[in-house]
Amino acid sequence: MIFKRQIQSEIQKKMDSGKIILLIGPRQVGKTTLIKTLLSESDYLFLDGDETTVQAILETANTEVLRNLTSNYDCVFIDEAQRIKEIALKLKIMHDQLNIQKLIVSGSSAFELNSLMQEPLTGRKWTFHLHPITWLEFEQEVGYLKSEQVLEQVLITGLYPEILKNPYPLFTNLLKHSKKKGC
């Protein structure tokens, strides 16, 4: 089940603006899924900042290396970008010196707090914040009746996409934990 996110149309409108799209949010709220959905009909380069090889390449890359890496793509998506040292400078180079039509970056909330990210990208980015699924998004996907039927469960688990898809491991874990604590 993939939820249509309210922010999706806002991001879509800015995709051809020539600015970097920066999507920030906590872990497991669906940042990667949302961007991949938006890019589903595009040919794009996906760089996963969790991969040490990607980190090593981007951290040491000069302009020529970045050009060679991205030259066959009009769109580049860097996921988990907060894991890449000096990423703001690399993004500035990609934006200013390379002809990348769409540059999309996602990362955790701590990513934006990094003051090094702000200065180099001033005026070069649109920042969007993705939160767990809203009640409206949930209700639109599953319908009013179903949403009311699972309200109590949702109040316990929250509206994180993975938990909504498969809540039973969480409940099993909570039950096991409560038995250990004597609750």
Question: What are these model-predicted stretches?
Answer:
Residues 23:
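Hydrophobic anchor at the beta1->P-loop junction of P-loop NTPases
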Residues 34, 38:
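Hydrophobic positions on the alpha1 helix immediately C-terminal to the Walker A/P-loop
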Residues 45-75:
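Short glycine-rich substrate-engagement loop in P-loop NTPases that contacts/grips substrate
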Residues 88-111, 118-120:
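Conserved catalytic/switch belt of AAA+ P-loop NTPases
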Residues 111-126, 142:
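Short regulatory helix/loop adjacent to the ATP-binding pocket of P-loop NTPases
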Residues 131-183:
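Interdomain hinge/linker elements that couple catalytic modules in large macromolecular machines
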